[in-house]
Amino acid sequence: MAWIKTPKDWELPNQEITPENIYLRRREFLSTTLKFSAAALGSLQLISPPTYAAEENGVERIDFTPESIASRFNNFYEFGVEKDQLWKSAQKLATQNWTIEVGGLVKKPKTLEVETLIRQFPEEERIYRLRCVEAWSVVIPWLGFPLRLLIDQLDPLPSARFVKFSTFLLPNIALAQKNRFWEPWPYTEGLTLEEARHDLTFLATGIYGHPLPAQHGAPIRLVVPWKYGFKSIKSIVRIDFTDKTPETFYTSMSPLEYDFAANVNPVIPYARWHQAFERIPGKEENEKTILYNGYADQVASMYP
């Protein structure tokens, strides 16, 4: 399938991408140009991106950094907390023939095959900022499709107001699920239905021009760029529509530290980290955190 890139007012120019090697490992911070080869991307339609809205809001541009660094530093709590090592453990996750169960307040519960979804929806590239609650920030080029396209197909009932997402429960593979058995596994997250239908909310199946590797949440994950990264659940196996706020992993363990909305906000300290500033790979000085991670023009109307 040809790669389709739909220009939007929130898009970043390519030179702001944090190469994959920094995103995952964040140890060396080198400024280079990220290059997509025809062999890596296949048959693509390349379109120059327009001005990125967050830049107008005062977010300074991020230099390119090599993809090789970003492939070795990541958060995937199911596989442990050693960010520079868990990518190895994540390779045990078998992602072939992956399915997603759909239930709750939906007209017809069903089982979705991810490979079919990838063929069904036009593939887009979305270059998004990703802001971790640990106060670091990167820029990632995702491949996938808007979540709203899937929601429209699933036909939720009028009473549905929220969407709950769940990941796998495989304690023999994801050892944190076994070693920290008292925690409320599997990992879950949720959005309001309005948030889930927003054009920015994305289901990613690829990154840096290739399919998602296991440590990034293969074969399909959520990306919600104006919220802290823990909202962007990885390796989704279930989607439920509900009429009540779903109980999610971190909020169920520590509701005073992790609120359900989890919108990026520089004036609200979050969990164990102050949020006024953020670390950006490749820069020595911290940057000021921007409300909604630079996407205020697009999402602020949802939070009066």
Question: What is the meaning of each model-derived region?
Answer:
Residues 52-304:
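Structured, non-membrane catalytic/scaffold regions adjacent to prosthetic-group chemistry
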Residues 3-4, 22-23, 28, 34-35, ...:
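A broad "ordered helical/assembly scaffold" signature
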Residues 28-51, 222:
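N-terminal export signals
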Residues 1-28, 49-52:
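N-terminal secretory signal peptides
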